[in-house]
Structures are given as structure tokens and as C-alpha cells.
Amino acid sequence: LPAPAARQAVLDVLIAPLPDPHREVREMAATTLAGVGRCSQRAHILPLSRTFAALAATPLPRRGAPGFDAALERVHAGVLGAAALVAAFPYDVPDWMPALVLDTLAPHSESPAPVSHTVRQCAAEFRRTHQDTWAEDQLRFGERVQEVHDFTLGRSDYFV
């Protein structure tokens, strides 16, 4: 196994293109990160989830305002990174995942494209990969289980 510094350097290289101005580059970086996340040590996941949550929390100015595009790229980078971590554990709900799903991803379901598109894709994939074990997996979300239902199925108040 590579030394911890080398492992961190690899992760840094994978994270660097997430805020790239080109959407395709961001999406491919997230796909690669999901694959590497699947086989990396779990000790690296929590710091990554914090990094992605901070990026996703970037305030978005109004569309057309100075800095909107750069802020949207940062938010999308955070959402892509968070979605990559969720995708890295398709049949498991680790301790860090409920907060990442509900506090980082779900709030962006109505954000401008391409952020909302990424969130909807992640929600659909999460629902697909967890449907067989949902009776057990939902216990990991505790009192917030309704929020994850809203995330994966769409908010019910939208249809009222």
C-alpha cells in the first residue's frame, strides 16, 4: 500500500478537477472518484465528505450576477463529490452517509442546472441500489427517514 502522503496526493489529484469550468471534466472526475472511493480506506471518506459539504454550501448569487458561474461550479463540485461518495457505497449506509445525503445533497434538488440534475441522478441511483435492503437501511436515517423518502421520491408537497 502507498504511504499515507501518497494516498492523500492521489485523492488531491482526483479532487482538483471537480470545480473545473467544463462540466464534462467535473463529471468524469466524480466518476473516477466514486471508483477510487469504493476501494479506499474509510478514514479518508469523512474528510472528503466535509470538503464536499463545504463546497456545496457555497452561496449562490442571483443568476447573471458577477461570480454566479464560479459559485455554481463550486456548488456543482461539492454536489458531484458528495454524489461520488454515495455512489462508492451502493449497498451500504455508513455512519456519515445520512448527513451527506440530507444536509449536502437534498437541499440542492431545486438548485440551478446542472446541480439539480446531479442531485436527481444521485437520488434515483440511491433508491435503486437500496430498495432491496431499505427496511434495514432506513434505520440508519433515524427520525429523518421521511426526508430521505422526499429526497429519493421527490417532495410530496410539490404535487399538492
Task: Indicate where each model-derived feature is located.
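Amphipathic, non-transmembrane alpha-helical secondary structure
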Residues: D12, R50-A53, H76, L80-A83, ...
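Short coil/turn segments at helix-helix junctions and helix-capping linkers
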Residues: V13-E27, V36-A43, A65-H76, D92, ...
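Acidic, Ser/Thr- and Gly/Pro-rich intrinsically disordered linkers and low-complexity segments
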Residues: A53-R74, R120-A124
